């Protein structure tokens, strides 16, 4: 058990330092690994003595308890990454996961919103509510900049360069990039700042752009997810959408407008008048 924890700690350091994973991705890798570690402990199997049949029984268990095939595939992909690390770190000479197969899953294309649907969602925001203007600013920023939700919630006041028409974003692996922001999004954020100035923002959160009206702290990804789900429902949209839908729609609309796919992360085309 102690050796397993030592190996887990080394793997965590490897993911953090060598792979430069974001905290959320790192947590997901370790949570999935812990599922395997718990299984091995219950079975009385040392992690360095695992064979393919052990991993196949673990994979079968994921199916038996009703874990979605896509989640199964993600977990097993993380397990394979762990055993590649064990080979690289000289814990093992052979990889028992090399022939491990995941569930067969079809390619599921993400939902895309039309420009009209995006406008309808933004229009469904109730400006009379305390968080109304903030939510409009969030939606405009998500769409016009094509941000990940993790990038949105961590956006700082010191990252805004409105005069130049850019914002600075810290993406996956702590990589920073400059992203163009639309005049419409800038205007919505400036209107939101009139409300934000009246919020008692807690210490250590003063530099976050989007904060909770009640708590005075930065928003969580889950809060953004629920907000978008509710607004889409209010707008009569039946598609299964999430914050990432805005990012995917942004990229799709750029392509439809003639943008180069490789240029999408750093470019912005005015899609709405």
Residue ranges and their predicted role:
Residues 1-4, 8-273:
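Conserved catalytic core of the tyrosine transesterase superfamily
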């Amino acid at each position: 058990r102690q050796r397993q924890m030592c190996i887990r700690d080394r793997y965590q350091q490897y993911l953090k330092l060598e792979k430069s994973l974001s905290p959320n991705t790192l947590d997901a890798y370790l949570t999935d690994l812990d599922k395997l570690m718990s299984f091995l402990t219950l079975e009385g199997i040392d992690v360095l003595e695992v064979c393919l049949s052990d991993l196949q029984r673990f994979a079968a268990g994921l199916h038996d308890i009703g874990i979605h095939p896509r989640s199964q595939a993600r977990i097993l992909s993380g397990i394979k990454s762990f055993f590649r690390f064990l080979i690289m770190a000289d814990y093992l000479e052979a990889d028992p996961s090399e022939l491990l197969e995941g569930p067969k899953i079809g390619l599921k294309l993400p939902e895309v919103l039309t420009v009209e649907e995006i406008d309808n969602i933004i229009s469904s925001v109730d400006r009379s509510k305390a968080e109304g203007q903030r939510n409009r600013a969030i939606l405009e920023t998500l769409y016009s900049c094509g941000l990940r939700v993790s990038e949105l919630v961590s956006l700082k006041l010191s990252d805004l360069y409105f005069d130049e028409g850019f914002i600075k974003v810290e993406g996956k692996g702590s990589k920073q990039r400059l992203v163009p922001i639309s005049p419409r999004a800038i205007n919505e954020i400036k209107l939101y700042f009139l409300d934000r100035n009246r919020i008692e923002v807690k210490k250590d959160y003063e530099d976050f752009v989007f904060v909770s009206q009640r708590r005075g702290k930065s928003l969580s990804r889950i809060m953004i997810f629920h907000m978008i789900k509710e607004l889409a429902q209010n707008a009569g949209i039946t598609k299964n959408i999430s914050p990432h839908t805005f990012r995917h729609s942004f990229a799709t609309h750029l392509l439809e407008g003639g943008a180069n796919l490789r240029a999408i992360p750093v470019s912005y085309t005015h899609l709405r008048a």
